[in-house]
């Protein structure tokens, strides 16, 4: 499976999350302005709380939409095994006997999809593991995470 396929799978995953978040934000907006949240006294804050929730959910939906947009135009360069890990690299690693793949990408961090029967997790620059992997080479052992790099592409 190519990196472009992983990115497409991550975009599909995020699009599903976006649909759920947009529906939740719409419902929260309705709850904030609906008859059922009309204030019944000066200490009744249901409408205010619902409006805060609607705002936060709308912001989260915008973040997910932005991530999808960034990933759809992201074209990672090929990486040879002798090259150091950089943005766009697909890293195969072993951690305590478990094989896992990481794709270093500009957005979509934390998303996990299947790659060759294993989990592939997207790491972004905000991640400490992303920062630890940058510049590492095939065969390196990352001391702080006990992660052995088995392959890069």
Go through the PLM ranges and name each one.
Residues 1, 7, 29, 36, ...:
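Mixed-charge, polar/low-complexity N-terminal
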Residues 1-67:
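Helix-rich terminal scaffold detector
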Residues 34, 63, 77, 143-145:
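Alpha-helix boundary/interfacial micro-motifs
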Residues 55, 59-99:
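Long amphipathic N-terminal alpha/beta scaffold segment
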Residues 80-147, 153:
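Non-DNA-binding regulatory cores of transcription-related proteins
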């Amino acid at each position: 499976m190519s990196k472009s396929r992983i990115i497409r799978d991550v975009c599909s995953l995020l699009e599903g999350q976006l649909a759920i978040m947009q529906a939740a934000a719409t419902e929260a907006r309705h709850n904030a302005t609906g008859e059922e949240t009309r204030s019944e006294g000066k200490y009744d804050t249901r409408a205010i709380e619902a409006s805060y929730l609607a705002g936060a959910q709308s912001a989260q939906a915008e973040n997910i939409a932005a991530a999808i947009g960034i990933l759809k135009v992201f074209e990672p360069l090929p990486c040879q095994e002798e090259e150091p890990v950089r943005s766009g690299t697909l890293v195969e690693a072993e951690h305590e006997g478990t094989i896992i793949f990481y794709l270093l990408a500009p957005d979509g961090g934390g998303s996990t999809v299947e790659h060759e029967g294993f989990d592939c997790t997207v790491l972004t620059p905000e991640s400490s593991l992303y920062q630890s992997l940058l510049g590492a080479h095939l065969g390196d052992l990352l001391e702080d995470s006990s992660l052995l790099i088995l392959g890069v592409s």
